[in-house]
């Protein structure tokens, strides 16, 4: 039995963990088990969720305890989920603008509220006014469609293109950096933005996220 051997083995395990799973080691420093190497976003959004902010709080505490570490921040966008998410956001923006015009409101579309009662009629008007291939009835006119089907077709019609997705990925990274500076009290000199990119969702690994790496 060798105490020195046990200490050496623990030391080796820590080194291996620091190399293979640095964020797991970082989380354990502040008594947390959460995966800190990424933070997820809702499809089409670059606004941090409550759970995302809680994760950044943990990450900020860990970085405070290790002032020599620097963080690389890389925004990602899922070609499928985020493209559809951007399409839904554009659809809702147009619906709110339509209501504002109809009611004579001189306000931005984000400030317009659409009630559940108003929504189907506004959606139908938007669907009818957009120029894209739509399902036809037996005499060649556009078919009357259920709300869910119109939403799906309009989201596909307005779906984000590659440039939109890259822009979304970069905005996510910037949102994370801003949060860490303003609310996490992390020095800007320790935070580095990397170019945004596309990442497909694989299993439980969502593509609509921001990835972190340590320097």
Language-model regions, residue ranges each:
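Extended terminal
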Residues: 1-206, 215
């Amino acid at each position: 039995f060798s105490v020195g051997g046990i200490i050496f083995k623990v030391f080796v395990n820590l080194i291996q963990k620091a190399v293979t799973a640095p964020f797991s080691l970082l989380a354990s420093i502040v008594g947390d088990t959460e995966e800190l190497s990424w933070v997820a976003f809702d499809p089409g959004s670059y606004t941090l969720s409550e759970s995302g902010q809680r994760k950044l709080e943990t990450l900020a505490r860990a970085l405070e305890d290790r002032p020599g570490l620097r963080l690389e921040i890389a925004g990602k966008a899922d070609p499928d989920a985020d493209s559809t998410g951007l399409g839904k956001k554009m659809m809702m923006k147009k619906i709110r603008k339509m209501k504002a015009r109809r009611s004579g409101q001189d306000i931005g579309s984000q400030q317009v509220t659409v009630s559940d009662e108003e929504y189907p009629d506004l959606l139908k008007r938007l669907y009818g006014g957009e120029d894209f291939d739509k399902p036809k009835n037996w005499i060649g006119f556009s078919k009357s469609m259920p709300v869910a089907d119109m939403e799906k077709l309009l989201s596909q019609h307005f779906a984000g293109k590659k440039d939109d997705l890259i822009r979304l990925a970069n905005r996510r990274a910037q949102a994370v950096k801003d949060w860490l500076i303003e609310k996490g009290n992390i020095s800007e000199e320790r935070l580095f933005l990397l170019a945004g990119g596309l990442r497909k969702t694989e299993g439980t690994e969502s593509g609509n996220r921001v990835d972190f790496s340590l320097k």
